Structures are given as C-alpha cells and as structure tokens.
C-alpha cells in the first residue's frame, strides 16, 4: 500500500525523492506520539528524503523533516505548535491548551498556500 501511494504521488507530479538509507523518526518524537502513529506511515516516512508538490508549498513530513531546523527560515516539523506557543506568550493556560492539542495531533502534512 505504501509503495502504491508513493507511485500515485509521483503520477500526480509530486517531487518524491527516495531516501538513500531509511531515516527513522527520532526517538523523542516517537516517545510523544508512537502509540498513535500507524506503522504504514512510519514505513512511508522512512523511505523518503522528500515528498512535496510541484510548488514546494505542500509537503508530507518524512524522515529528514524531523531533524532540527537549520535556519530561522526552515519549517520545523512541529512549526504549527511552535507558532501557537509563541502566540500564547506568557499565558500558561493557553500554552497548555496548545501543547495538549498537539499531544493528540501528530502532523504529517504541511501547506503554506
């Protein structure tokens, strides 16, 4: 099923670059979300180095995306959570609501359109 989905994405003109070696999801991410991540998604994410649409504005998070951002312009895998925490500022109740939400919602896809 994973290979068929990758083939389908390629047929839709997505830029799908296989990983030279499998890139596992980091342990800190797995410890937070591992109980809820389907094995099929781990297989998909580990097989690819990149998976984005033609514009580069839509992408599936894959193994290398879970490494820390290298520059301020890079999107972190948990960028939406970070933005929410930044918006919450010193409001601890709001920050907890943001964290609680992201504790139960694992991001697999981002879009900047």
Q: How would you describe each model-predicted region?
A:
Residues 1-112:
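A surface-exposed partner-binding patch
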